[in-house]
């Protein structure tokens, strides 16, 4: 079965009528109808299969899809509706209850207006300080629906693993000034070692959502994280405050320190915790060493991302010299 042709021809019983918009990502095909969107993971993304998760294996792909849906449905049920299977029925193709015998698994979502994507609203100056507080608060409230899993790795060891991944991530992007990046990476590594005794515990570990300005919607005062299931299983757990620092740092880049503080303030209110603010510089550099290269990666298909990547670079310089 050619999944793409089947959806584009409008031949899937139970899906929308007419021809959908076809959105192609590195690892998925998304078919967007007027009210619903249908996401199917690819099996042939060599880079993803070799470096993150081997989706060429059907059993593994189905397992990944199930976990992805369950995770995102719990965090943003307004968007992630249900999981279905795609199967041959008679002479046609239909959405059915998901099972291992299906041709593919399909994540069914309510459609979203991408003009409400947080990155686009930040670029357009459409988010104010009150919004920042509300976003931090709502994000904190949403994370409370997840219980803390049993995690055997210490925060210290996890940060060392993440640091190794980060070095490879940064060095894989030719547009990144490696001399600048090496300075920031050295700071991150030294901080981890200096805090070894404090980090050498599992108590600081928690679930990690792949959440940032590209992976969230802000519409009518509601903050909706999207696509937050990490591509690599090891990244699903980590220092419990990585999540909010990733969100808050993006607001710092575009709006300023007051916005950063407001996001954190709202999160602290919702979760009844106090963040270690003496870690701010470390956490900001950590988050930016993810987002700076990432924006260059995205610029291969969206040229406007170069300006965003350069904005992250200048922000890093400001934090470094501040």
Q: What kind of feature is each model-predicted range?
A:
Residues 3-191, 197, 213, 221-222, ...:
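Conserved ATP-binding subdomain of kinase catalytic cores across diverse folds
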Residues 203-209, 213:
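Catalytic-loop of the protein kinase fold
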Residues 291-322:
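ATP/Mg2+ or Mg2+-diphosphate-binding catalytic cores
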Residues 176-184, 206, 303, 322:
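Long amphipathic alpha-helical segments
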Residues 225:
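Walker B beta-strand of ABC/ABC-like P-loop ATPase nucleotide-binding domains
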Residues 196-205, 220:
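Electropositive polyanion-binding surfaces
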